[in-house]
Amino acid sequence: MADTKYIFVTGGVVSSLGKGIVAASLGKLLQARGFNVALQKFDPYINIDPGTLNPYEHGECYVTEDGHEADLDLGHYERFLNTPTTRANNITTGRIYQNVIRKERKGEYLGKTVQVVPHITDEIKRNVKLLGQKSQYDFVITEIGGTVGDIESLPFLESVRQLKWELGQNCLCVHLTYVPYIAAAGEVKTKPTQHSVKQLQEVGIQPDILVLRTEHELQPDILKKVALFCNVAPDSVVQSVDVPTIYEVPLVLQQQHMDETVLRKVGLQVGPVPEMRQWHEFLEMKHTARETVTIALVGKYVELQDAYKSIDESLMQAAIYNRKKLNLISVHSEKVTEANVAETLKDMDGIVIAPGFGSRGVEGKLIALKYARENDLPTLGICLGMQCMVIEYARNVLGFKDANTTEIESNIEHKVIDLMDEQKTVTDMGGSMRLGAYDCALRKGSKLAAAYGKEFVRERHRHRFEFNSQYREAFEKAGMQCVGENPETGLVEAVEVPACRWFVGVQFHPEYNSTVVNPNPLFMAFIREAIKTRKKDKE
């Protein structure tokens, strides 16, 4: 295809409507038609990236293959399209301003007064076009974070306005709004959508397609009314009714021919219907699963739905491919005690010890790990979860009662988890961890190697602290094996206890490499062991 097509997804009325899911779903439909699709997210906050944001503020921090800390929507993009993202797929206001100020300091603006228009907007447009200029993508779908009317979003919307003018038919705007149902009146209200579109029009953007989020199916007369008052063709008004799982959204949009509407508007032939066989099979497995596997996720942010989003989705995908429903039980690690751990975990088929930072909730994780190990409950530790496995084993098996990570306590004898050497001179907090994909050599014959079916893997990381290799021999003799290491540095990446059914910890984040059509083998193996445990306990 000669020219890259650019699609912008904006949102109105309220936030958290699911712009990322709509963007990913549309991208999936276009990809299924044979097009190469890139998805990117523009976030209007002034942070350079979300790496230093509290999960309570922003949910999960996603990590890309090339080591960029990114918005959790990039996780949706990868899970839907099964293609990796990079630093170029997530841009913030902070990044834009940082680039512009750096150019100003270098004298690239030749003494001109640096302003929002044109300098900030030009930098935004440059980043929008960056992926398209690589000439490998037919479509670039850009999600604009925030809600129309937010002051933070204005430079991005102005950039979209300019691009729609410059690109002509090669550019269109999809606007997602909310149509509330008023129970007292027994009817839906379209006025918020009308006002949202009016706000968009006031900044010079006429949406080409409207997607209406709603709890109840909208009647044709409502859709026609929205089309009339929002200046949009009737066949360009799409409704997105609440569905049991986000993975049904592509099919909901396909049933209303949204992908065909997009193709016609950008001047392309509609062609054959998308090839969605594997997607349908995935949903069929989900809907027909009868038995349940129950997994406890032990972490300190579990009350926030998006804090461990990629882990939640990876477990769900693995359960579905193992023909089971996932019953995920959130266990707040701060509330786990010696007195209640047995009651809390006794009905679990397996537990996952979540990643994180800091001391809060760590003791609860250690108590949960001791119970799981002693009761042979399948356990997967991720990042800090693996480090907690090492600490628990050191205290209760090796007898190192003061064992800890120096992230929490440095004035101890047994520093079984310590700051990485290359991190000891780092002073900045943002973007300075060990980030991105690294190779890991797996020990032949280990449970981890069996899970992956190979002896070398490449997974993503986000950490500053590591297993202290001075203790490696002591752990090996005591029964905890170091079964994964970086082939270049010797850094221990994974541990397991062979005497247990499944007691495996990994320093990396396998959840960032798990998609709808390609679930991560580690989660698949963990869920299989949990299912076996469930069956054995029933016998």
Swiss-Prot record:
The keyword Ligase is annotated on this UniProt entry: yes
Enzyme Commission number(s) of this protein: 6.3.4.2
Residues reported to bind UTP: S15, K189, T190, K191, P192, T193, Q194, K225
Entry keyword set: ATP-binding, Glutamine amidotransferase, Ligase, Magnesium, Metal-binding, Nucleotide-binding, Pyrimidine biosynthesis
Keyword Nucleotide-binding on entry: yes
SUPFAM superfamilies: Class I glutamine amidotransferase-like (SSF52317), P-loop containing nucleoside triphosphate hydrolases (SSF52540)
Region Amidoligase domain: start-end pairs: 1-268
Pfam family, one: GATase
Assembly information from the UniProt record: Homotetramer.
Protein name per Swiss-Prot or TrEMBL: CTP synthase
